[in-house]
Regions:
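N-terminal secretory signal peptides and thylakoid transit peptides that target proteins
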Residues: 1-15
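Beta1/beta-strand and adjacent pyrophosphate-binding region of the FAD-binding site
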Residues: 36-48
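Short beta-strand "acidic-cap" motif of Rossmann-like dinucleotide-binding folds
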Residues: 64-69
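Glycine-rich loop(s) and the adjacent beta-strand/alpha-helix scaffold that form part
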Residues: 214, 218-283, 437
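An anion/pyrophosphate-binding glycine-rich loop and adjacent beta-alpha core
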Residues: 257, 261-263, 270-376
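Conserved small/polar residues in nucleotide/adenosyl-binding loops
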Residues: 444-449
Length: 449
């Protein structure tokens, strides 16, 4: 059995140190059926970026493959993601005049995770993701020119597709899947993974439930690929590890509920790093849209309701999460000038214009006017902006923002700000895997065949 989860280790703080076998109770294993309703060589669970990639590669290698999606549309979290992709691609970083390499990416990712991640997995990710960029181009993805440091990314190595969002990856992969004859079946929910015996033997296939409640057993002659994503859309599971997250919104699509992980545990797979739950600023409580002017973080600062900065905006996402959750009403405001707005709009134009139209993002010709619109003390906000602009000159920030991110003053009108709040974004743990994406069996550390 193989596991190919795009979200595992992304961001660098996933842990491979501790197993959490009691997580939400592992599902009981399915009984082996006497007959099978259908058979494929490879069955892929989930139609996000990982699932479609796995299905396409399997199909191109000659396997009779199928991708199963429990929701009514394909795409998973990739479909609703911002689309930013970190990779140390030599042509890109040399053109930008930036020092980078897959080895530096690996080193920074390990450090960003407090060295708790599995070094072999981190190296596998960082060394192979440049090839993933080229593979995406092969299947039809077009990227915008240039790279930048995305919020929480810690280094300028991110790029976005031309269409700005992760939906471009899904569109390209679906078109390619159709061309090569790979079936992607929606409203096909996997409700169990079948092994020869609960504690021994190979993985045989899956139990599938249809929209009308009917169930079938589908055999996998060669492999089952679990690419079903995490559990950030399941507040109960998240609160098991961090009660602060229970009432937060989520950036995830509703299918990210974690049941496939329980099925993996039910047949002997280990679960690791489940308490690493990443949050990002997104839609504030009581609002319908997001003021997304913080992706190009070198142009943006965060203010609390008192009008003061409270964190280094280029810090790790867990640092920003904890600092933001400690602020008044857990609501803060990204602030930028027109240069910052234009830069962020290279990636999130449509989203920001919707936010402007719907009163979630505010625009003013002076900082004082902007402060009144977002209801923070004008004199404090003006002083904060002036202090920050002075830091750009001195390259020193008491909160610890790095000099490379102290590069753009907030001086050019009009100015922009809007409320944001923390949302559950990325459950960084999952099933324990090796560098071949195989799942070891609990206690023995043999791999599931």
């Amino acid at each position: 059995m193989t596991l190919n989860r795009r979200s595992f280790l992304v961001g660098g703080a996933a842990s491979a140190a501790a197993s959490v076998s009691t997580f939400a109770h592992a599902a009981n294993p399915c009984s082996t059926p006497t007959t099978w309703d259908k058979a494929y060589d490879v069955i892929v669970i989930g139609s996000g970026g990982a699932g479609l990639s796995a299905g396409i590669v399997a199909k191109e290698k000659g396997a009779n493959a199928v991708v199963l999606e429990k929701l009514s549309i394909p795409g998973g979290n990739t479909m609703v993601s911002g689309g930013g992709l970190n990779a140390a691609v030599e042509a890109d970083y040399k053109k930008a005049g930036i020092e980078d390499s897959p080895q530096l990416h690996t080193k920074q990712t390990m450090a960003a995770g407090d060295f708790r991640a599995d070094p072999a997995l981190v190296a596998t990710l960082c060394e192979n993701v440049p090839q993933s960029v080229e593979w995406l181009k092969k299947v039809g993805v077009q990227f915008k020119p240039g790279i930048y440091q995305i919020y929480g990314g810690l280094w300028p190595r991110c790029r976005n597709p031309v269409g700005q969002s992760g939906g471009d990856y899904i569109k390209a992969c679906m078109n390619y899947a159709n061309r090569i004859g790979l079936p992607v079946l929606t409203n096909h929910k996997v409700v169990g993974i079948i092994r020869e015996k609960p504690d021994s033997g190979r993985v045989l296939g899956v139990e599938v439930e249809f929209k009308d409640g009917k169930k079938e057993f589908w055999k996998a002659n060669k492999a089952v690929v679990a690419a079903a994503g995490g559990f950030a859309a399941n507040p109960t599971m998240c609160s098991y590890f961090d009660p602060r997250l229970t009432k937060l919104n989520t950036t995830n699509q509703p299918g990210s509920t974690g049941e496939v992980l329980k099925y993996i545990q039910g047949i002997g797979g280990l679960a690791v790093g489940l308490d690493y739950i990443q949050c990002i600023p997104w839609t504030a409580p009581g609002y319908k849209h997001t003021a997304d002017i913080f992706q190009a973080i070198e142009y943006t600062i965060f203010l609390n309701k008192e009008g003061k900065r409270y964190v280094a905006e280029d810090a790790r996402r867990d640092v920003i999460r904890d600092a933001t959750l400690a602020q008044t009403d857990q609501t803060v405001f990204p602030v930028c000038d027109t240069d910052g707005f234009d830069k962020n709009n290279e990636y999130y134009n449509e989203m920001n214009h919707r936010a402007l139209e719907n009163g979630t993002l505010f625009k003013a010709d002076t900082i004082e006017e902007l402060a009144k619109l977002i209801k923070v003390p004008p004199e404090v906000m003006v002083a904060t902006i002036n202090e920050y602009n002075a830091m750009v000159d001195s390259k020193k920030d008491p909160l610890g923002r790095t000099p490379i991110m102290l590069s753009h003053k907030i001086v050019k009108a009009p100015f922009y700000a809007g409320p944001i709040g923390m949302c559950r974004h990325h459950t960084m743990g999952g099933a324990k895997i090796n560098t071949k994406a195989q799942v070891p069996v609990s206690y023995t550390h043999l791999t599931l065949p």
